[in-house]
Amino acid sequence: YAPNATVDFVNVAIVDWGSKCQSETENYLSAHPDTDYIISIYDSATQYIVPAVKSTGSSAKIVAYNGTPFAVDYVKSGDIEMLIGEDLLTIAYATVDYEMRTDLGMTQVEEPTLYRVWTSENVDEALNADGKCEYGIGYGDSAKQAYEKIWGLS
């Protein structure tokens, strides 16, 4: 909680990320050199935000959401401070479970999907043998086991 924090927004449409995200971030950081954090609602935009922070010499830290492998690699390299990742396999299982229950007229159940906060302290758990992140690593397999048991697949 930061009662004295101020928040500004720099909105760049997804279709414009490649042409505007870096320059808009650079312009903002140049005008606001005391910026502490940049929050990217989609981590795919960080491929443009990271170079902007570096080119301006800003000390702003980057945090983001999604868990896209290259963004998790940015956590490993220290370019992103924190990333909230979602397990796509769990989301896929939950989606199929919902659709199957609907088709079979079964009662729906509330099923949380898995999220994990990636930082420099735990990011190695998301890496494969080559030291790169890939989807599905680092979230465990409890959801897969549970869905397979529910649907008689194990």
Feature names for model-found ranges:
Residues 1-154:
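A residue-level marker of the well-folded mature domains of exported/periplasmic proteins
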